[in-house]
Design a protein with these regions (language model features):
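Conserved beta-strand edge residues that scaffold enzyme active sites
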Residues: 25-26, 143, 188
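Active-site-flanking alpha-helical
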Residues: 57, 150-151, 184
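GST-like fold's C-terminal all-alpha helical module
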Residues: 83-178
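Terminal-tail/helix-coil boundary detector
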Residues: 180-189
């Protein structure tokens, strides 16, 4: 159910990369943080999901997902980074409380603050999506992988949510992609 693992699996399917998934202690030990995902490509070991996304797109020359033109690439990378630094940070507490039911996240004030910040982030995304079909323009890019999974978490979390029509339309567009149905909109928040 890890959003970070699902990012990598979704990207592999979009790019057409064959992979073997291994969920064992030796693989987790390759990451000094003890977390997944960890990618092993021959003798090269890489961890951090968004870095893995970029590596795969670069290695497989998936320029439709990660453009080479500097401003187009920067737009994609900005949204990838925004997902990791702003969007994830906003939803982490509320999601841990409301979906994972983690007792370490039971402070109602923090839950409400996280929900408010999360809603604000979805509003930022909704505004961007009123101008484009996807987050970095009118074509699906690598940025839509982490953002799409975060949007899935938004819709799967049991809480009151204001209407964000552009985000809803985006979620429906992503749902036309088989890899998103496998790794995103699959009943797993």
């Amino acid at each position: 159910s890890s959003i970070n693992v699902r990012k990598v699996l979704w990207a592999c399917e979009e790019i057409g990369i064959a992979y073997t998934r291994e969920d064992s202690a030796p693989e987790m030990a390759l990451n000094p943080n003890g977390l997944v995902p960890v990618m092993v490509d021959r003798d090269f070991v890489l961890w951090e999901s968004n870095t893995i996304l970029r590596y795969l797109a670069n290695k497989w020359r998936a320029t439709s997902l990660l453009p080479t033109e500097p401003s187009a690439r920067a737009e994609v990378e900005r949204w990838i980074d925004w997902q990791a630094t702003e969007f994830n940070t906003a939803w982490r507490y509320a999601f841990s409380a409301l979906v994972r039911r983690n007792p370490a996240f039971d402070d109602s004030r923090w839950i409400e603050a996280s929900k408010a910040d999360w809603t604000r982030m979805v509003g930022i995304l909704d505004d961007a999506l009123t101008r484009h079909l996807y987050v970095a323009g009118d074509s699906f890019t690598l940025a839509d992988v982490p953002i799409g999974l975060s949007v899935n978490r938004w819709f799967m979390t049991p809480m009151d949510q204001p209407s964000f029509p552009a985000v809803t339309a985006y979620y429906d567009r992503l749902s036309r992609r088989p890899a998103f149905l496998t790794h995103g909109r699959n009943g797993i928040p």
